[in-house]
From Swiss-Prot:
Taxonomy of the source species: Bacteria, Pseudomonadati, Pseudomonadota, Gammaproteobacteria, Enterobacterales
Role, per record: Isomerase that catalyzes the conversion of deoxy-ribose 1-phosphate (dRib-1-P) and ribose 1-phosphate (Rib-1-P) to deoxy-ribose 5-phosphate (dRib-5-P) and ribose 5-phosphate (Rib-5-P), respectively.
Protein name: Phosphopentomutase
GO cellular component: cytosol
Matches recorded under SUPFAM superfamilies: Alkaline phosphatase-like (SSF53649), DeoB insert domain-like (SSF143856)
Assigned keywords, A-Z: Cytoplasm, Isomerase, Manganese, Metal-binding
C-alpha cells in the first residue's frame, strides 16, 4: 500500500536563496533567526530557552539548515543522529507567494509573473472598484491600500460595522483581500462578494493569484479577531499537478487538510477537511492518515506559522508553535506504514525578525521519512518541483515536466 503524507509548515524557511537580492531578502533566515533569539533568551514568552526541536532535528532539519546557510542554528544539535533523508530546496518560481510555492511543490512552478497592486495608497484601479460596488450593490468600500490584516481591522473595523462598507486591501503578494464582519456583514455575503471579485479580476486580465475572504468578529478596535472561516479563491494551476495526475491516471485520492484545496483551486482534490489552529490541524491529519487507503496523499497546510507568527513578526509565538509541532510529530511518524513516505516542507519563508510584514525568499526544508527511505543528505535541490517528481515516480504517474526524483 502506497501513501504519501505531505506536511507544509507554511513559511518555515531555512535561509536566504542565491537570488534573495532580487527580493530584498539577503540574510533572511526564518529558522536561524528564531533559534538565535531563543538562544539569547529573547523569545521567553510562555516558552523558555534554546529552540527545542528534537524530532525535526532527527529528521534532518538542522543539517538541512546547515547546508543552506553554512552554519548550525544557534542552540541546536548539529551532531544528532539523523533517521530521515533531508535537503534544502531553491524556488524556481518567479515569486515568493503561497500558490507559487505549493504549485511548485506539486511539480508545476510558476514561471510567469503574477499581477500586483503596487501602489500603497489607492491600490486598486477605479474601474475595478466601481464594478464591485455596482455588481455587489455595496454602499462603498474602505481601505483600498496595502496593510497588515490585523492593523487594518483596528483602523477601519468600527467604520465598517457602522457603514456596511467592506474593507479592501492588498500586500506585496498577488492578492485582493476583503475583510468583513461575520455577523454585521454576514459570511455568505462576504463569500459572494469574493466570488464577484474573482470573476472581475479574471475577466479584467489582472492576473491576480488569490482573492481572500478575511472574516472577523469583535465589537471595537483592539478586540477584533479574524476567524477560521477564511476562504481563498485561487486561479487554477497552469498545468496538471502531481495531485491531478494521481487522481486522473491512477484513480488515487488526495485529501486536503486546511487550506490546501483553496490553494489548488480544488484541482486534484478528492476530499476536503477543514480545521483551524495547529492542534486541530494535527488532529484532523492524524484521523485522515489512519483512514487513508492505497494511492492516497494526505496533504496538510499548517498556516499558523505564516499568518499568526511570520507576518506578525512574532518570534516567540513562532518558536512556541514549532515546539508544539515537534512534540506532536511522533504521533504522525507512528502512522507511517512500511511503504509510506512522510514529507515535511514549506512553501516560502516569512522571517519573523525581518523588516516589514511580507514573505522572505528562502530555501525550504525537504525532510523525507519512511521505513524504506535511506537516511542522509539529498543535498541542494534546484527546485521545489523535485518533491512533485519524487511523488510522480513513487506513485507511478506520468513524469512531471520539472524536477528530479530524490529517492
Amino acid at each position: 500500500m502506497k501513501r504519501a503524507f505531505i506536511m507544509v509548515l507554511d513559511s518555515f524557511g531555512i535561509g536566504a536563496t542565491e537570488d534573495a537580492d532580487r527580493f530584498g531578502d539577503v540574510g533572511s533566515d526564518t529558522l536561524g533567526h528564531i533559534a538565535e533569539a531563543c538562544a539569547k533568551g529573547e523569545a521567553d514568552n510562555g516558552r523558555k530557552g534554546p529552540l527545542n526541536l528534537p524530532n525535526l532535528t532527527r529528521l534532518g532539519l538542522v543539517k538541512a539548515h546547515e547546508g543552506s546557510t553554512g552554519k548550525i542554528a544557534a542552540g541546536m544539535d548539529g551532531n544528532a543522529d539523523v533517521i530521515g533523508a533531508y535537503a534544502w530546496a531553491h524556488e524556481l518560481s518567479s515569486g515568493k507567494d503561497t500558490p507559487s510555492g505549493h504549485w511548485e511543490i506539486a511539480g508545476v512552478p510558476v514561471l510567469f509573473d503574477w499581477g500586483y497592486f503596487s501602489d500603497h495608497e489607492n491600490s486598486f484601479p477605479q474601474e475595478l472598484l466601481d464594478k464591485l460596488v455596482k455588481r455587489a450593490n455595496l454602499p462603498g468600500y474602505l481601505g483600498n491600500c496595502h496593510s497588515s490584516g490585523t492593523v487594518i481591522l483596528d483602523q477601519l473595523g468600527e467604520e465598517h460595522m457602522k457603514t456596511g462598507k467592506p474593507i479592501f486591501y492588498t500586500s506585496a503578494d498577488s492578492v485582493f483581500q476583503i475583510a468583513c464582519h461575520e455577523e454585521t456583514f454576514g459570511l455568505d455575503k462576504l463569500y459572494e462578494l469574493c466570488e464577484i471579485a474573482r470573476e472581475e479580476l479574471t475577466e479584467g486580465g489582472y492576473n491576480i493569484g488569490r482573492v481572500i475572504a478575511r472574516p472577523f468578529i469583535g465589537d471595537k478596535a483592539g478586540n477584533f479577531q479574524r476567524t477560521g472561516n477564511r476562504h481563498d479563491l485561487a486561479v487554477e494551476p497552469p498545468a496538471p499537478t502531481v495531485l491531478q495526475k494521481l487522481v486522473d491516471e491512477k484513480q488515487g485520492h488526495v485529501v486536503s487538510v486546511g487550506k490546501i484545496a483553496d490553494i489548488y483551486a480544488n484541482c486534484g482534490i478528492t476530499k476536503k477537511v477543514k480545521a483551524t489552529g495547529l492542534d486541530a490541524l494535527f488532529d484532523a491529519t492524524l484521523k485522515e492518515m489512519k483512514e487513508a487507503g492505497d494511492k492516497t496523499i494526505v496533504f496538510t497546510n499548517f498556516v499558523d506559522f505564516d499568518s499568526s507568527w511570520g507576518h506578525r513578526r512574532d518570534i516567540a509565538g513562532y518558536a512556541a508553535g514549532l515546539e508544539l509541532f515537534d512534540r506532536r510529530l511522533p504521533e504522525l511518524m507512528e502512522l507511517v506504514g512500511e511503504d509510506d513516505i512522510l514529507i515535511l516542507t514549506a512553501d516560502h519563508g516569512c522571517d519573523p525578525s525581518w523588516t516589514g510584514t511580507d514573505h522572505t525568499r528562502e530555501h525550504i526544508p525537504v525532510l523525507i521519512y519512511g521505513p524504506k527511505v535511506k537516511p542522509g543528505s539529498l543535498g541542494h535541490r534546484e527546485t521545489f518541483a523535485d518533491i512533485g517528481q519524487t511523488l510522480a515516480t513513487y506513485f507511478g504517474t506520468s513524469p512531471m515536466d520539472y524536477g528530479k526524483n530524490m529517492l
